Amino acid sequence: MTPELGNFALVLALMLAVVQSTLPLYGAWREHAGMMAVARSTAYGQFAFLLLSYLILTAAFIQQDFSVAYVANNSNTLLPMMYRISAVWGAHEGSLLLWVLILAAWTVAVAAFSRSLPLEVVARVLGVMGWVSVGFLLFTLLTSNPFDRLLPAPAEGRDLNPLLQDPGL
């Protein structure tokens, strides 16, 4: 059930990214302050849902939920906790989710620290950042979903790439 919540949080983040990429740009074109003001709140919401999704994936690794294909392919019951947590970004799907989360964090930074700029400029910048998020989130959900299920769940996972099992990484 919990991995479905992570997937649902990704879908909600995508919906907010679509709103962030369209309404503020349309509002800037029509000089509608209300539509432009939506940019900041959608940026905050998108970050919140992506953070929730990332934390749910991390919890799946900690709890060794092998019904999640990404967890089953990159962890096992003998893997130490430190490597289970770092395995979250140890392969394609997790690193892409981390990348989208970092992108959303930068979007929040732009939204938070651009108060002195004209609203039209902020709306255009956040709108373009929304389009970038839409692209990455669509790619994540359609081709690299870290919450794909593996049913029935195996009793043991495959293990993290041995090259990544180093304290320096």
Language-model-detected regions and their locations in the chain:
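Polytopic transmembrane helical bundles with strong interfacial aromatic enrichment
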Residues: M1-L169
